[in-house]
């Protein structure tokens, strides 16, 4: 029986790079620290649409590169939002110095992470899952992606029995290592329970 492999992990070093760069003896401690940093950032900049968090460590300095759909929301008036974020990080990890740089995502509708987050938000607003999927597919096709696949799993439309449904358009060559498949998962917390969202995107060249 064939097994599915993670599309991003499968392509590390070919079309994708690691999201953290550091070498350390205290591997498990720093890995947990990275996870906590990512969780804090995702909670803080939820409305800004965070697509990627890149962490680079140099001794006691951390360089954060945040890829955002709407960086202006995070920056806020006179950069107050960014200052507050830096203060929160410094308070929680006082032994580290922080450098934060923001990168605007040029094409949010062709980004699997942002599209999965958007779709999860629509499901939380009680929009019918088929309609939400159609809208997400239309947004991606409008910007000219080569292929897209969306799968939702759970108690869809409040059904008693959980199930999975998926829709695909265009080419999604999961076995082709040269294909830079963009993959993301998100959770929609509805009154009926959690609905899982998966998005695969094959961007245009």
From Swiss-Prot:
Keywords: Chloroplast, Plastid, Ribonucleoprotein, Ribosomal protein, RNA-binding, rRNA-binding. Residues 37-106 form the KH type-2 domain. The keyword rRNA-binding applies. It comes from the Eukaryota. NCBIfam families: rpsC_bact. PANTHER family: 30S/40S RIBOSOMAL PROTEIN S3, SMALL RIBOSOMAL SUBUNIT PROTEIN US3C. This is Small ribosomal subunit protein uS3c. It comes from Cyanidioschyzon merolae (strain NIES-3377 / 10D) (Unicellular red alga).
